[in-house]
């Protein structure tokens, strides 16, 4: 069990650092990693919403708004507060299966603790990029529902 925890910790560290992770596994929760072109894990989303399409649409819409709002607030916040916002985004992203957003948010959380402005700025740009990707995917998904 301890060895499995160590491997999971290593995968999380690799993902946060932007390094490749073990194929077929997510960096933090052991879920399957999707091909790069797939931004939202639709199977995970369906499981979380118990197959309710209206609930899936609702949580996707909520994530879209929340992530955009928190990202905007980060720009006027201290690194500590931005890290707290990133923590919220990471949890929400995991809920809808937006694994790249979750990993980027975890990276920003860690960068916020480092007192390294350059690393923090890179992590913020990465998070903004992955959120924009997820928002585009969400809008496309909602348009066909």
Predicted features and spans:
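C-terminal compact regulatory domains
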Residues: 1-31
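Long, amphipathic alpha-helical coiled-coil segments characteristic
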Residues: 38-88, 95, 119-142
């Amino acid at each position: 069990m301890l060895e499995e925890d160590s491997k999971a910790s290593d995968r999380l560290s690799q993902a946060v650092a932007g390094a490749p992770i073990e194929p077929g596994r997510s960096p933090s929760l052991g879920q399957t990693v999707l091909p790069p072109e797939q931004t939202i894990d639709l199977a995970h989303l369906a499981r979380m919403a118990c197959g309710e399409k209206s609930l899936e649409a609702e949580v996707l819409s909520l994530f879209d708004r929340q992530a955009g709002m928190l990202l905007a607030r980060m720009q006027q916040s201290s690194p500590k507060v931005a890290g707290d916002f990133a923590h919220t985004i990471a949890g929400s992203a995991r809920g809808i299966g937006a694994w790249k957003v979750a990993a980027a948010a975890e990276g920003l959380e860690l960068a916020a603790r480092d007192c390294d402005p350059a690393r923090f700025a890179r992590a913020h740009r990465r998070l903004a990029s992955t959120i924009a990707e997820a928002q585009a995917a969400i809008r496309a998904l909602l348009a066909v529902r």
